[in-house]
């Protein structure tokens, strides 16, 4: 796994490309667009203490709330109090950056999963490359859509399950991790079932 320098350089190049595709001009699209009028808004409602009804489990909304809060704590962000803002006044970058980060991290995750199954560096690099350039994953990573959390936690769960089959030490820890991650998948949206 990443045994030689050439493989490591190619993997890092794919990761750099993935970050570039997801973060370049991330805040340029004025928001909220598409389903961003729902998911990040509900996260914002958690921050402001506003009551609302939501049909899905709350993890994605908690993550959006954390994303907005962390972004607004940055020293170069000049904001008086988040309670005084309306959702439409938020910088779209505040609720999109976490999706872009997790979408970028899908590439090494896909590499490690493919390597855990097939034990072939070249195949794992191809899988990682296709995850980096996949159009659907790019859209889900660049907009505040909850689907990227399902994919990220789901692929992490599969990786842990694959590791449990080849673990030299006690595989129960890998299986327990896989179960916790599957619980996170279900706590994002019901279609995670």
Regions found by a protein language model. Give the residues of each.
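Short acidic/glycine- and proline-prone juxtamembrane loop motifs at membrane-interface regions
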Residues: 33-34, 136-150
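Membrane-interface transmembrane helices that cradle and orient dolichyl/undecaprenyl
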Residues: 1, 116-118, 157-175, 185
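Transmembrane signal-anchor helices characteristic of membrane glycosylation enzymes that use polyprenol
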Residues: 6-36, 48, 184-185
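Short helix- or helix-capping micro-motifs
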Residues: 15-18, 127-132, 139, 159, ...
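Transmembrane helices and adjacent periplasmic/lumenal helix-loop junctions
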Residues: 136, 141, 176, 180-193
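Transmembrane-helix motifs of polytopic, lipid-linked glycan transferases
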Residues: 12, 16, 85, 89, ...
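Start-transfer (signal-anchor) and selected internal transmembrane alpha helices
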Residues: 1-21, 105-109, 115, 121-126, ...
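Interfacial juxtamembrane loops and adjacent helix segments
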Residues: 52-100
């Amino acid at each position: 796994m990443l045994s030689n320098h050439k493989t490591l350089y190619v993997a890092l190049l794919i990761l750099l490309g993935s970050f570039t595709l997801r973060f370049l001009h991330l805040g340029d699209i004025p928001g909220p667009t598409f389903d961003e009028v729902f998911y990040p808004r509900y996260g914002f409602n958690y921050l402001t203490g506003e009551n609302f009804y939501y049909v899905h489990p709350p993890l994605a909304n908690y993550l959006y709330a954390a994303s907005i809060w962390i972004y607004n704590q940055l020293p170069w962000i000049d904001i008086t109090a988040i309670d005084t803002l309306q959702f439409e006044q938020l910088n779209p970058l505040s609720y999109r950056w976490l999706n872009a980060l997790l979408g970028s991290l899908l590439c090494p995750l896909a590499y490690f999963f493919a390597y855990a199954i097939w034990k072939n560096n070249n195949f794992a690099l191809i899988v990682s490359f296709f995850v980096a350039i996949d159009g659907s994953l790019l859209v889900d990573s660049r907009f505040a859509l909850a689907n990227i959390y399902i994919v990220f936690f789901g692929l992490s769960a599969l990786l842990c399950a694959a590791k449990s089959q080849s673990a030299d030490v006690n595989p129960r820890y890998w299986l327990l991790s896989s179960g916790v991650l599957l619980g996170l998948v279900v706590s994002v949206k019901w279609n995670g079932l």
